[in-house]
Amino acid sequence: MIEKFFCEIRAASDQSALEAKFAAAMRSLDVGTYNYGAGRMVAGEGPTVERFWTNMDPAWLQRYVERGYQRTDRLVTAGLVRVTPFFFEDVFCTPPLLPEQQEMETMFPFKKGIVVPMHSPFGRFGMVSAATALPADLWEQKKFGVMASISLVALLAHQRSEELAAQELAADAPLSERELETLRWSAYGKTSEEIALILGITERTVRKHVGSAMAKLDVKTRVQAVAKAIAAGLLKI
């Protein structure tokens, strides 16, 4: 069964088709409610989510956003710093420290499930949380096998989603040869002054090309521009 979903996820031609295959895979693994988010960490701002899939109850999701639970959600916080999958119970086994966390976790209807954190270079990340629909006794029997299967599906779906997003970016924001050159040398750690000497142009022109690339890629720093260009397949280093 899982092998079938692997093939279908890899073959998904757009984000909507991929989300549908991901949802079907989650159902087959007895997941009652899931969330998938992907984006990047922004210096001084924290995580910025670019894609989000969920089958969560709209009323709960609305309350979650209105109350700002995402800022103190212990599952999210743990997922941003851990590198291996973990159970909801691993987090909820200790009492919350903040009143906001206590409020959220009292209202949170899911106590057993799995979080799969996924981290890539240059601050890219993805995260899947999956609340089980299994009865408590079956969950205890099967949870490690379920964790392995959900983790594989999450990793494959996230990789494919990143690839599709990169293809869309490459089509929407083509970079000029000069913009690519300045980003390529930036990726090698060269300063604007050094890039100017290498390319035989002025430092001001280097900054202009880098700034233009940043605008096209919708990022705020040179490092983010390099990361996004590499992820999109626009830049080979």
What is each of the regions a protein language model found here?
Residues P99-G123:
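Helix-to-coil/beta transition segments that act as allosteric "coupling" elements at the rims
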Residues T54-L98, E103-T106:
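Regulatory sensory and allosteric helical modules in signal-transduction proteins
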Residues R178-T182:
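The N-cap/first-turn positions of alpha helices
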Residues A38-Q62:
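GAF sensory/regulatory domain recognition
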Residues M1-E8, Q15, E19, G126-S176:
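Juxtadomain coupling helices with adjacent low-complexity linkers
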Residues R222-G233:
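Short, basic, alpha-helical segments at the C-terminal edge of helix-turn-helix-like DNA-binding modules
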Residues K21-M26, D30-A43:
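Short, hydrophobic-rich beta-strand element in sensory/regulatory alpha-beta domains
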Residues T191-Q224:
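Recognition helix of helix-turn-helix DNA-binding domains
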